[in-house]
């Protein structure tokens, strides 16, 4: 009996030695789920039932077979065809192939979308600056819709550019320049039957240092919303005496509209060349 009892500790020790010989797995590793192979092809993960077109979106774009190395898609081809037709239509309805001239001996300087009109009168230099960007008034939903019998040219509303413009008046050897910020009120556009009405108005008036490229906000600016009407009328007469009147404003709209249409056609042509990668 005693030899048998002596064998028990030895057996237990051997068993414990066997347990310590095999390292135990960490608890964190046991809690992690075992990885399972994906049973669905990757190409079907983003495709909904009944959609046979979306699988093509997962494929990388293939360069053109012409060897240019550029990307040409069916959408680009349709886009180019649309732009080609659009350019033809815009050139067909273009009123002025060249920019119209202003009466009153105004000299025109154009730099992209910005234009300047310069004139000298009795020792004074008058400069009118405007930019055609965002100069097309929005089309309201309340406008009458064309009838079905009208032509496509008649259905297209005429694009009229009415930009804000700045008038600068500088005296000879003067250190200050009188600056008048003018704009076209929307309710005055097209009211040509009212002979006494001004088609443009003065919004702000200020003095700026002559020759400064940037205007200073620290200079006092007069807002005409709260201005005495007598003073406002004198300012309008001041501009009219220097050639900035209703006739000038009408011609400025015609010039700005022609310039805006010209730049729009150029933009369409550049966009077409960009899409074609030329």
Curated annotation (Swiss-Prot):
Tissue expression: Ubiquitous.
Modified residues (Phosphoserine): 197, 201
Sites of N6-acetyllysine modification: 88, 91
Known outcome of mutating residue 92 to A: Impairs RNA binding and mitochondrial translation
Keywords linked to the UniProt accession: Acetylation, Adaptive immunity, Apoptosis, Cell membrane, Complement pathway, Cytoplasm, DNA damage, Immunity, Innate immunity, Membrane, Mitochondrion, mRNA processing, mRNA splicing, Nucleus, Phosphoprotein, Ribosome biogenesis, Secreted, Transcription, Transcription regulation, Transit peptide
Membrane topology: Peripheral membrane protein
Transit peptide: 1-70
Gene Ontology terms describing biological process: apoptotic process; complement activation, classical pathway; cytosolic ribosome assembly; DNA damage response; innate immune response; mRNA processing; negative regulation of defense response to virus; negative regulation of double-strand break repair via homologous recombination
Residue positions, PTM Phosphotyrosine: 184
GO molecular function: adrenergic receptor binding; complement component C1q complex binding; enzyme inhibitor activity; hyaluronic acid binding; kininogen binding; mitochondrial ribosome binding; mRNA binding; transcription corepressor activity
Loss of function: phenotype: Embryonic lethal between 10.5 and 11.5 dpc. Severe dysfunction of the mitochondrial respiratory chain because of severely impaired mitochondrial protein synthesis.
The keyword Methyltransferase belongs to this UniProt entry's keyword annotation: no
Subcellular location: Mitochondrion matrix; Nucleus; Cell membrane; Secreted
Pfam families the UniProt entry points to: MAM33
Ranges for region C1q binding: 73-90
Region Disordered: start-end pairs: 133-162
Keyword set includes DNA repair: no
Entry GO CC: cytoplasm; extracellular region; mitochondrial matrix; mitochondrion; nucleolus; nucleus; plasma membrane
Record-linked SUPFAM superfamilies: Mitochondrial glycoprotein MAM33-like
Region (Interaction with MAVS): 165-209
Function (record text): Is believed to be a multifunctional and multicompartmental protein involved in inflammation and infection processes, ribosome biogenesis, protein synthesis in mitochondria, regulation of apoptosis, transcriptional regulation and pre-mRNA splicing. At the cell surface is thought to act as an endothelial receptor for plasma proteins of the complement and kallikrein-kinin cascades. Putative receptor for C1q; specifically binds to the globular 'heads' of C1q thus inhibiting C1; may perform the receptor function through a complex with C1qR/CD93.
Protein family according to the UniProt entry: Belongs to the MAM33 family.
Designated name of the protein: Complement component 1 Q subcomponent-binding protein, mitochondrial
Gene it is expressed from: C1qbp
């Amino acid at each position: 009996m005693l030899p048998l009892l002596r064998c028990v500790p030895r057996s237990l020790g051997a068993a414990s030695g066997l347990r310590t010989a095999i390292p135990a797995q960490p608890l964190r590793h046991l809690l992690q789920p075992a990885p399972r192979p994906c049973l669905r092809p990757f190409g079907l993960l983003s495709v909904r039932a009944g959609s046979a077109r979306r699988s093509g979106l997962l494929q990388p774009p293939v360069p053109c077979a012409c060897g240019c190395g550029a990307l040409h898609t069916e959408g680009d081809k349709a886009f180019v065809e649309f732009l080609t037709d659009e350019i033809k239509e815009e050139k067909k309805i273009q009123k002025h192939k060249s920019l119209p001239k202003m009466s009153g001996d105004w000299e025109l300087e154009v730099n992209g979308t910005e234009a300047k009109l310069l004139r000298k009168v009795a020792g004074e230099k008058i400069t009118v600056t405007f930019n055609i960007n965002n100069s097309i008034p929005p089309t309201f939903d309340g406008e009458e819709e064309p009838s079905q019998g009208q032509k496509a040219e008649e259905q297209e509303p005429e694009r009229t550019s009415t930009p804000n413009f700045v008038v600068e008046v500088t005296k000879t050897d003067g250190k200050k320049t009188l600056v008048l910020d003018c704009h076209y009120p929307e309710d005055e556009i097209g009211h040509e039957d009212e002979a006494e009405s001004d088609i443009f108005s003065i919004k702000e008036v200020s003095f700026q240092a002559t020759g400064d490229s940037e205007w200073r906000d620290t200079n006092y600016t007069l807002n005409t919303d709260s201005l005495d009407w007598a003073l406002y009328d004198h300012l309008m007469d001041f501009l009219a005496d220097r050639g900035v009147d209703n006739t000038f404003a009408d011609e400025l709209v015609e010039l700005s509209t022609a310039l805006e249409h010209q730049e729009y056609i150029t933009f369409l042509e550049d966009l077409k060349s960009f899409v074609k990668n030329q």
